[in-house]
Curated annotation (Swiss-Prot):
This is Nicotinate phosphoribosyltransferase. GO terms for cellular component: cytosol. Transiently phosphorylated on a His residue during the reaction cycle. Phosphorylation strongly increases the affinity for substrates and increases the rate of nicotinate D-ribonucleotide production. Dephosphorylation regenerates the low-affinity form of the enzyme, leading to product release. Nicotinate binds at residues 33, 180, 222. Its cofactor is Mg(2+); Mn(2+). It catalyses: nicotinate + 5-phospho-alpha-D-ribose 1-diphosphate + ATP + H2O = nicotinate beta-D-ribonucleotide + ADP + phosphate + diphosphate. 5-phospho-alpha-D-ribose 1-diphosphate binds at residue 391. Keywords: Ligase, Magnesium, Manganese, Metal-binding, Phosphoprotein, Pyridine nucleotide biosynthesis, Transferase. GO terms for molecular function: metal ion binding; nicotinate phosphoribosyltransferase activity; transferase activity. Catalyzes the first step in the biosynthesis of NAD from nicotinic acid, the ATP-dependent synthesis of beta-nicotinate D-ribonucleotide from nicotinate and 5-phospho-D-ribose 1-phosphate. Helps prevent cellular oxidative stress via its role in NAD biosynthesis. One of its GO terms (biological process) is response to oxidative stress. CDD domains: NAPRTase_A (cd01570). Belongs to the NAPRTase family.
């Protein structure tokens, strides 16, 4: 096929400014054995061999039945920049075993990914075990050298996007989700990747300022407990004045807040003497700094007896001067109970002081939240509008790695298979195409792998789908729609598709998830999604298996 037939006409070169967002991703970000294998291939005169590798995973993460594919754009950036610098070559000369021929280093210095072709499913698409999410064709040595880096770029990205998508599903579409995990992430790059791919998976924003700049993700945040505890009395307020939003006249915000606090103490049955004066001072100070964006942490001392009283007083004071507060954050305690208490408080204030917008104040909850926490809060009838989630999200608490693998399936047109006593680790040989078959109601029924030489399944035509390793498991499927999963994304040194924005990938995730039946997505005991092979590929796999499996001998 030529470039035009592959959709590569004209190509798309990677923006070099975008390419260098992470300078760590380079050819030396690999395992040593990739380079020693490359030398052995070179010594064996295999530089002209053409290979096909499949990048796939064997099991879905988090005890679920789907995975979100992410990281493709980063893989394309890596291919675009793939080149060993002179300093790389000098380092390898010092590091590799003695006796490596000088010509090999010259060979490495001239390597690029120009002769590589990369096929992939669209980033943001739901993917399933054994179906390759990336397929790489090209010179054996080059595609071997790509292995570790591609796995690094796909494994965490897909795991993170999947984790975020699961949080989105349990939280519901009307609750905001914010990623607060930078300080708990596995290093700076882990923090950036977590912010990027949590947004991909369905989160609404991040606290990570650099991620906001690099990826155009909405940046959100309030303040820490330290801000509240840095004040101990109202006497510490250096300024109390703020301009009225409409008139521009300077007014004493503290004076308004103190007056409202006295009235609120009767309404809420809370003594002003029990509430923290330092907390009130801190909230007044913060409100003066951000009168249109006032959101306060209310659990520094006592949510009921201090935080809600002081917040409501300052919010009403801002209202006197033409401003509307945004809401509160609760970072400890019984989140279900406290959120209900806060909502009840706001409703009382709205009615008593004739401020209907108080009913719409946002309640943000944080504090080591995970999937199970949200499910429990849902059962308790919480009133939380937004979750700030950090540690368990970015560290993927329930499963720290996805386990993608990169396996040789064909060389010089000849299929290759890896055998194992563990059937799960037997590879599916040969160059393959993948199709997703849909029912009449638009739900995905099954993913089907075929040899590239086979014609694609046809709409309305019966297709025999077989389990790749269990002979008795087979079924006829009559698809109402057939989707070819692979597109050529890289060929002849060019990107062959218009790359989507992060926002478009994020939308793709939700669209793709909607194609799955609810029983595939449920948290408890989800129904496994079926992945099958064609009858032709089934016979091909098992014939090759028998050809390569040693025959035992008993005596």
């Amino acid at each position: 096929m030529n470039d035009r037939e592959l959709g590569c006409a004209g190509g798309q070169f990677m923006d070099r400014g975008r390419m260098n967002q992470n300078g760590v991703v380079q050819p030396l970000l690999t395992d040593l054995y990739q380079i020693t294998m490359a030398y052995a291939y070179w010594k064996s005169d295999k530089t002209d061999d053409t290979a096909v590798f499949d990048l796939f995973f064997r099991n879905n993460p988090f005890h679920g039945e789907f995975t979100i594919f992410a990281g493709l754009e980063e893989c394309l950036k890596f291919l675009d920049s793939f080149h060993y610098s002179q300093s790389d070559i000098e380092y390898l000369k010092q590091t590799l075993p003695e006796g490596i021929e000088h010509e090999f280093f010259e060979y490495l210095g001239n390597l690029t990914a120009r002769d590589v072709t990369l096929y992939a499913i669209d980033e943001g698409t739901v993917a399933f075990p054994r179906v390759p999410i990336i397929k790489i064709e090209g010179p054996l040595i080059i595609v071997q050298l790509l292995e570790t880096t591609l796995l690094t770029l796909v494994n965490y990205a897909s795991l993170m996007a999947t984790n975020a998508a699961r949080y989105r599903m349990v939280a519901g579409k009307h609750v905001k989700l914010l990623e607060f995990g930078l300080r708990r992430a596995q290093g700076p790059d882990g923090g950036l990747s977590a912010s990027k791919y949590s947004y991909t998976g369905g989160f609404d924003g991040t606290s990570n300022v650099l991620a906001g700049k690099l990826f155009n993700i909405p940046v959100k945040g309030t303040h820490a407990h330290a801000y509240i505890t840095s004040f101990s009395s109202i006497g510490e307020l250096k300024t109390r004045l703020i301009k009225h939003k409409q008139t521009g006249i300077l007014e004493d915000l503290l004076e308004h807040a103190v007056r409202h606090r006295a009235l609120l103490s009767h309404l809420l049955d809370v003594s002003t003497e029990e509430s923290s004066e330092g907390e009130l001072a801190a909230m007044v100070s913060y409100a003066i700094a951000f009168p249109d964006g006032f959101m306060a942490l209310v659990d520094t001392y006592d949510v009921k007896r201090s935080g809600l009283l002081n917040f409501s007083a300052v919010a009403l004071a801002l209202n006197d001067l033409g401003y509307h507060a945004l809401g509160i954050r609760i970072d400890s305690g019984d989140l279900a109970y406290l959120s209900c208490l806060a909502r009840e408080t706001f409703e009382k204030v709205a009615e008593r002081f004739k401020v209907p917008w108080f009913n719409k104040l946002t309640i943000v909850a944080s504090n080591d939240i995970n999937e199970d926490t949200i499910l429990s809060l849902n059962e308790q009838g919480h009133k939380i509008d937004c979750f700030g989630i950090g540690t368990h999200l970015v560290t993927c608490q329930r499963q720290p790695a996805l386990g993608c693998v990169y396996k040789l399936v064909e060389i010089n047109g000849q299929p290759r298979i890896k055998l194992s006593q563990d059937v799960e680790k037997v590879t599916m040989p040969g160059n393959k195409n993948a199709y997703r078959l849909y029912s009449a109601d638009g739900h995905a029924l099954i993913d089907l792998l075929q040899k590239v030489s086979e014609p694609p399944p046809a709409v309305g035509q019966k297709v025999l789908c077989r389990h790749p390793f269990q002979e008795s498991k087979r079924a006829y499927v009559i698809p109402s729609h057939v989707e070819s999963l692979y597109k050529v994304y890289w060929k002849s040194g060019k990107i062959c598709q218009q790359l989507p924005t992060l926002e478009q990938v994020r939308e793709k995730v939700q669209i793709s998830l909607k194609t799955l039946r609810n029983d595939h997505k449920r948290t408890l005991n989800p129904t496994p999604y079926k992945v099958a092979v064609s009858d032709n590929l089934y016979n091909f796999i098992h014939d090759l298996w028998l050809q390569n499996a040693p025959i035992g001998e008993l005596s």
